[in-house]
Structure formats: structure tokens, C-alpha cells
Curated annotation (Swiss-Prot):
Keywords: Cell membrane, Ion transport, Membrane, Symport, Transmembrane, Transmembrane helix, Transport. This is Divalent metal cation transporter MntH. The keyword Transmembrane helix applies. GO terms for biological process: iron ion transmembrane transport.
Amino acid sequence: MKNHVQTHNKSLDEINNTVSINTHGKFSQKLFSFLGPGLLVAVGYMDPGNWITSMQGGAQFGYILLFVILLSSLSAMLLQSMTIRLGISTGMDLAQATKHYLNKPVAFVFWIIAELAIIATDIAEVIGSAIALDLLFGIPLLVGALITVFDVFLLLFIMRFGFRKIEAIVGTLIFTVLVIFVFEVFIASPHVTEVLNGFVPSSTIITDNGALFIALGIIGATIMPHNLYLHSSIVQSRMYDRNSIQSKAHAIKYATMDSNIQLSIAFIVNCLLLVLGAALFFGVNTEQLGGFYDLYNALQNQPLLGASLGAIMSTLFAIALLASGQNSTITGTMAGQIVMEGFINLKIPNWLRRLITRLIAILPIIICLIVFNSNEAKMEQLLVFSQVFLSLALPFSLIPLQLSTNDKRLMGQFKNKLWVNIISWCLIIILSILNIYLIIQTFQEL
């Protein structure tokens, strides 16, 4: 590796070093000034991809996959804290650090995989938004998918009001989703003992190929590659002293608190989704268990709710789904910009970047809709496959993150502690082994 020299461009230059922080007030005031980037990252942990994998996990295997959500969320907290340290201590995002650390041909391969991961993320957002538009307004899935092309202009409009406003809008939408699902799980009345037992490890997760497939989907939907790139960049939006070790340490401390708080909320939402799927569907013999349409119809026809309340709750569910898809669009756009600028130093207009990504993402969806005659179950299956691809792509983000954050020449006193190295390498190795096992099993069953 080359010696680190601060010659790289600023990450996301338009928001870099633009948000003031409180360094002399009370603890709560200091923390509040850092709250925000974690919200944008948490969005990726509760996007439509999480919805379908968590709901299908609950519907097909009851509560046993709650342990996977817990493990994934704790792992995510550690990994996001590593991206925070990388961004604040070096002034580089993960894409820039990867390019800096690897030789050009290898970095190019990693860039392609990062771009494909962002497209896979976008597929989930398009499908979720298209289904929400169908549920709310009866818009055909094909038309709904095409309509999502125009949300490319959403971020451009919101960005005019400043980065802090984006954080506030995203936070409001996340809170809305949380409240909706807390109430819906309350109505579904799951058995508390069974839910708590779901957090205990079960061998079924490994021995049952179906459970392993959904478990990897949950991991892929929870620990998302684009979030690692995103977080390492947007933490640099705060106006800490770039030349002060003490100021950087202060920023890392509060940015990590922000991250852990928001990821805890995302953890709760994902658990609620799985519990909802299990409470309504586990043991029910249907062709497609725990899909968006199934859950929407179940809420609408839930005897406990009655006709009027059922209609309200199913509509709220669809609104939350649409909000989730749009939230993820905001962060996906930023991540795409970070990856393209960081790896190949190519700056193109945001609207064009977004349009290219969205058009590529829509292509497999349109093919799926045409070939399977707008079959809803096939759309939801495509979404699950997109999440499994994210799980396969994850090591290509994790390995550069691990190598970069453990390099003293790059990180100085902020390099990884021994326990961080042990856990992060274990995560990378275990995930890689599970991925290889899954691929072998999948091909054997073809």
C-alpha cells in the first residue's frame, strides 16, 4: 500500500463540513447536533427488501429467525462504527479508501460489484414502491415500476433545503413506519413467550436450506454494502476540526452513538415485521407466504380489526411501504454518487446518475412482469433474490473496510482494536462460507 497522503477529493463535496456541531453544551445538545447520518443509514436497514425477507422468514419459519435479525443488527452496529472511524479519521469514504488500498484492476472489480449492489438495492425499492402504488391506487405493477423513474427528481428537490432538512424528513418517515408496525403487531397478538424464544439460536437456521436462504436474505437486507459507503461519507457533513485528534475523537464518539440509536430503531422495526409475518401466516398453507399482498389482505380482513379499522390499517401499511421505498431512494442516490466519485473519480449530474441506476434496475423487473404476466408472487421472489445477491456482494465491501481500518499508516491512533479485528474477520469468514454453501445447495437443487 502507498503511504497515505491527503490528496483525495472531498467526499460528497456539496454536504461535506456543512452542519455545525455543539461542542460546549450539555450532553444531550452535543448528541443532538450529531443525530442525523445514522437516520439515513437506518433507512437501508428497513427498506422494502427487509420487509419481504423478514415477513417471509416469519411466515415460513415462525420466530426462529429473530436470532438472525439480532445477530445482523449487532454486527451492523460494529461495521457502521468502523465506517465512521474511517470517514472521520482519514477524510476518505470507503470507496476512496478501497481505491487507495487496492491496485487498479482489483479496485475496478470491487467498483463493478459495488455498482451491482446498488442496483440490487434499487430493485427492492422499485418493487416496493410499485406494489405500494398498486395497493393504494390500483396502478398496474408495470406502470408503477415506470412511474418510479420520476422519483429521480425527489432528492434534487429536497437537497435544495439543506442536508439537515433531509435528515428531518427521513426521521419523520421512519417514526411513522415504527408507530404503524407497533400498533399492527399489537393487533396481531403474538405469543410473547414464542417471540422471546426466537432470539435463542436454532440449528434449523443452518440445517434447513429454506431457512438458510431466508437467513442470508435477512443478512443481505440488514448489512447492506451501500450503507458502508454512505455512512463513511455523510459523517463528514459535521463541522469538526479536521486537524485535531481530540475533535475527531469527539466526532467519532457522538457519531457512533447516533448510529447505534438509529440502528436499534431499525432492529425493532425488522423484528416487528417478522413477528407480524409469523403471527398472521405461520402454519397457513398458501402458495406465497408473507408477501406484501398477503399481509395487506390479511390486515384488511383481520376479524379482530373489523371492516373499517382493517381498511385503515391496510392503507397505513401501503403508505409505510411507499414511504420506505422513497426514503431508500434518497440514500441510494447518495451512495451511488459516493461509489462512482470515490472509485473512478467520475462526477456526473445527480439526476443522470439516478436515472441510469433506476433504468438498469427496472429492466429485470419489466422482464419479470412481462414473462410471468405481472405475477405478484414472482415480483416478490425477485425481490428476495436481490437481497441474497446483496449478501453475496457484502464481503467485497467488508474486506476493504477491515483492511483499511486496521492500517496504522492510514488510521493512526484510530485503527481497529484487537477485539474489533477478531469479530469483523469472523463475520467475513462465516458469511463467505455460508454464501458458498448456499450457492452449492442452490445448484444441486436445479
